[in-house]
A protein has these predicted regions:
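A domain-level signal for the structural core that forms small-molecule/cofactor-binding pockets
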Residues: 2-16, 39-223
Length: 223
């Protein structure tokens, strides 16, 4: 097995997917939806060929070598079809309603791809917000904002913050609370190999950050 060749292939795959949230030095950079980037499927195919060659072409049949790169590129194109979208755009249609109490959408299923190993992480998201001046969105839009934010190589921590920030950007609510619980295949299949372990992250904005009682009520509603 040629790990250096596999690493070169992985770099090509990531370059084909394009920038998704970090610069070389680890500093946060402009997300791809603000850069207008496009996915380069041919470069992804080239990277997959390198990975397969690094694994060992002698172990793989001709059909795999000929067609798997194309299939993997198409899979990533499907996984990351929302990557060029701003999550806040999922909340573009705003309604006016005389309601300023908590709105809760819980147990929103999602999957995303961990940017460290390009393996899935799967879980559920809970979204809570308190409208300001009656600005609300349709229930399905809360699920959609999760899907758009998840539809790119991600870290769970960043995903949680991006969902919360999208609601703040579009609705300017009194408060937002997002909680995500997910299991990561990079912990299940490799490394520590701990199937069943889950990670929980939260993002808290506005009233929920300042008001302990409101925060406790929100967490109780999504428990």
């Amino acid at each position: 097995m040629d790990e250096e060749r596999m690493e070169r292939g992985a770099r090509d795959i990531l370059s084909g997917v394009r920038d998704h949230g970090r610069e070389e030095d680890g500093a946060r950079c402009t997300p791809s939806y603000a850069q207008g980037g496009i996915m380069d499927e041919k470069r992804i195919e080239r990277g997959v060929r390198e990975v397969l060659a690094g694994i060992g072409e002698g172990c793989l049949n001709a059909e795999v070598l000929a067609n798997t790169p194309r299939r993997v590129a198409a899979m990533y194109a499907e996984f990351f079809e929302a990557m060029e979208g701003d999550p806040a755009d999922a909340l573009a249609v705003v309604y006016q309603e005389a309601y300023e109490e908590m709105i809760v959408m819980k147990d929103i299923p999602f999957f995303s791809i961990c940017e460290h190993h390009l393996l899935p992480f799967v879980g559920k998201a809970d979204v809570v917000y308190v409208p300001k001046e009656g600005r609300i969105v349709g229930a399905s839009k809360l699920a959609r904002v999760v899907d758009v934010a998840a539809g790119r190589p991600q870290l769970q921590e960043r995903l949680t913050s991006q969902i919360a920030d999208a609601l703040v950007k579009r609705l300017d609510p009194h408060g937002v609370l997002v909680r995500i619980e997910a299991s990561h295949l990079c912990m299940t299949l490799r490394g520590v190999k701990k199937p069943g372990a889950t990670m929980v992250t939260s993002a808290i904005r506005g009233r929920f950050y300042k008001d302990e009682a409101a925060r406790a009520e929100a967490f109780a509603l999504i428990a």
